[in-house]
Amino acid sequence: MSGDQIIDVGGVRLAYRVLGPPAAPPVVLLHGGSADSSAWADIAPALAADHRVYAVDLRGHGASERTDRYSFELLRDDVVGFLDVLDLRDVTLVGHSMGGVAAYLVAYARPERVSGLVLEETPPPEPMGLKVPRHEIRRHIVGQLNAPDPAWWDAVDAVTCPVLTLRGGPSSFLPQDRIAAMAARFPHGRLVTIPVGHCIHRDAPDAFLDAVRAHLRHADRPATPHH
């Protein structure tokens, strides 16, 4: 991918990498916790054959600015600001784990900018019982996963764009039945299991890409006018 570019979003400097044809449909990749945009190094070039791909370092990760506050609402606002500043429309958001939570919150907040979601191993908005790490950023984020805002279910129920939910099967540490239950609540949702654990895009990139490309073909399709 091209080198880091920096953009100011609400006073926070976010780094991102971009590749693919400038006029192609946009895809924004949102990494999981303890990762950064380089997590998509094998995925982004493949998607960039026919999409404009933006791989973002979320606040406090990679080359993006460290701040004194971290929450999913702030991650949501950062991504909304990113879409606004770059004027990205009809975007497919692809989020892994933490990035998936931010993605569906963005789709709820700004449905006019989001045409599709891919949620890879994304925890549902219910207590996860995860061990809280010492690392400051992870402590805030995991704390919210263990005590999520019940209003996040409103976001899940209200997302109207097509949603592909990918789960990693029994070797994942996330409760697979709860991921399936969340997937079933999206009005236009589809659930695919790729049984390689929590990091599907790393451990089964070909299967991941096949599922995402099929979803993108649907998300990119222009809406049929009603007569």
Where are these regions (language model features)?
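Structural signature of beta-strand start/N-cap positions in the alpha/beta core
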Residues: 26, 52, 89-92, 113-116, ...
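Conserved hydrolase catalytic core segment
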Residues: 89-127
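N-terminal cap/lid segment of alpha/beta-hydrolase-fold proteins
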Residues: 1-13
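Conserved HGGG/HGGXW glycine-rich cap/lid loop of the alpha/beta-hydrolase fold
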Residues: 12-65
